[in-house]
Amino acid sequence: MSADLARIAEEVSHRRTFAIISHPDAGKTTLTEKLLLFSGAIQMAGTVKGKKGGKFATSDWMEIEKQRGISVASSVMQFDYRDHTVNLLDTPGHQDFSEDTYRVLTAVDSALMVIDAAKGVEEQTIKLLNVCRLRNTPIVTFMNKCDREVRDSLELLDEVENVLKIRCAPITWPIGMGKTFRGVYSLLSDAVILFEAGTEKLVSDIEVIQGIDNPRLDELFPLEMEQLRMEIELVKGASNEWSLEEFLAGELTPVFFGSAINNFGVREILNALIDWAPAPQERDATVRNVDPKEAKFSGFVFKIQANMDPKHRDRIAFLRVCSGQFERGMKMKHLRLNRDIAASSVVTFMSHDREIVEEAFAGDIIGIPNHGNIQIGDSFSEGEDLAFTGIPFFAPELFRSVRIKNPLKLKQLQKGLQQLGEEGAVQVFKPHSGGDLILGAVGVLQFEVVASRLAAEYGVDAIFESASIWSARWFSCDDRKKLDEFVKTLQMNIATDAGGNLAYLAPNRVNLQLTQERWPDIVFHETREHAVKLND
């Protein structure tokens, strides 16, 4: 193995790239900050220390996330912990819920699921986990807020297994809850980690007592220990044993209990992500699978963020490095346009703060300045024609028809929507029967962002109105004659999206079911690949 390949393999083995997913208010933002605190990226709560020694307040990026048009961003943070480079991708809350959230999950190798132990599994968690399941992404689970009155722990595990359809292996177990929360018992190390409230508590302050039968524990809290021993006996008999193999296959989730606001349980999660979560894996491309330890650079764009810096009205394409070594100034081939670009101003992130990248390896997320030529799903390489797959469009859940007040601006509207559709800001459907263009989204905020960007970037004042569409499905058929017949017969429901793919716009659930039954040769798709055009 050459020195370069040996170094690439070494760097890749020390990369961990994961997303944090949760329902809003489960404590995700707090946990994100605490992970940064434990890693040393934050020197004190509220102040993030950049790699060059510069500081900025974490409240800066939290405030930015609240602003419209910027809150659609998913924060990307890179930090070092235990000789590993960790790439953490945060996902936005439900007001900002968009396809952007889904696509972030295509760029990671594992996910950390945060659940409010008082509420259990909630709607957005279900949606996000379903997306993780598309790629069998390994999931680590953190039951948060154990210092409050929470639900029964066994009940929570049961709910995760039944609702999310993933088996649980408890790694730590809570001792008491709310005002009587005493800490957690580690099933793997047979140790009790004592809890003491306080947002400034660090690892050095946390006391660990070895052995569940240690007499000191009975002296400290006899009632809770009696209850704990009964529960642990039950848990060992009723729950799944920890298996790294099943975790990596996405079939089993290790479960940790704690309180992020009190820094409790955070160290255990970070260690689990380093010890158990996978390093960057092979990625599927149209021509072959790509090994992260290959010599040549490759990667794909999973997100485009406009106006990250409101002062510069810029656009950044977020690229997940899939193989090789990226070096500043290198030439990269933009495969869709068959064009080379010189990568000199590529950046890395600490949330919205950035610095120029000198080098990057598989698993790293880098930002390429984009002047409108880069689309979501675009692949880059050192020359080889390989387009990465697994970057999906999702069937929209909300629809609006769009028209303009000034008919003279029609061309600008069409151009704007075409570009925004390609960028992935919204899905654009052109009905075959004529009439207004239809926009599709999975979150209301997407429409608001599109309206403001049409006005700011294209000078178009657009009117959005509700459309009588329940859902959209892309469709395909191996038999061209049957495909043409379907399109001709149901012309009133057929549209073409920004990528030139055919879609069926269903007015209601019954209509879609009946259509599927009547046309058994037509295959309906809830997702479609960026890199693959249907019916070609």
UniProtKB/Swiss-Prot annotation:
Transmembrane segments: none
Domain tr-type G: 13-281
GO molecular function, one term: GTPase activity
Subcellular location: Cytoplasm
Keywords: Cytoplasm, GTP-binding, Nucleotide-binding, Protein biosynthesis
One Pfam family in the UniProt entry: EF-G_D2
A GO BP entry: regulation of translational termination
Residues reported to bind GTP: 22-29, 90-94, 144-147
Function in brief: Increases the formation of ribosomal termination complexes and stimulates activities of RF-1 and RF-2. It binds guanine nucleotides and has strong preference for UGA stop codons. It may interact directly with the ribosome. The stimulation of RF-1 and RF-2 is significantly reduced by GTP and GDP, but not by GMP.
Annotated PANTHER family: PEPTIDE CHAIN RELEASE FACTOR RF3
Similarity field: Belongs to the TRAFAC class translation factor GTPase superfamily. Classic translation factor GTPase family. PrfC subfamily.
Protein name as catalogued: Peptide chain release factor 3
The species this protein was found in: Chromobacterium violaceum (strain ATCC 12472 / DSM 30191 / JCM 1249 / CCUG 213 / NBRC 12614 / NCIMB 9131 / NCTC 9757 / MK)
Lineage: Bacteria, Pseudomonadati, Pseudomonadota, Betaproteobacteria, Neisseriales
